[in-house]
Amino acid sequence: FWIHLNVDYPFHLTGILYFPRIKSNIDLHRNKIQLYCNQVFVTDSVEGIVPEFLTLLHGVLDSPDIPLNVSRSYLQSDQNVKKISNHIMKKVADRLEEMFKNDRPQFEEKWDSLKLFIQYGMLSEEKFYDRAAKFALLKDVDGKYYTFEEYKALTEANQTDKEGNLIYLYTTCLLYTSDA
């Protein structure tokens, strides 16, 4: 799926970003997002402009408000760059939440391709975690998906320790879970 960006205030930004299909032989090459300033190519190294967990996305961004001096130290101190980065993260979270709410079965089908981005974003960006906790999914051994809240409600009665804290059981290897 893709995200179209078109912002006029408080900064100018147009672009399109899309999530590539993740395969087992994942290509972790960054530099798949091209940055333009007034339709003139600037760089394909967008660290600092795009949140780190989203640099695996593909696409094109064009903004006259991004400085042509793209040194890392300059970008970290530029307020427009921080606003653009936060806006991109917000738009991605909004689009994912919209997909989850409007068509959950389709979202669940795409989850295996999206989960790498979402989980990495939740670990690296607190603001993204707050938004993504609503639509991040856990998969049980039967292949059914649950949100964090759904999983908590399902397991709260029988998966607590002696202090009453909920214990989450999780594995990435289904080979061993079938014997349990």
Where are these regions (language model features)?
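Conserved GHKL (Bergerat-fold) ATPase module
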Residues: 1-178
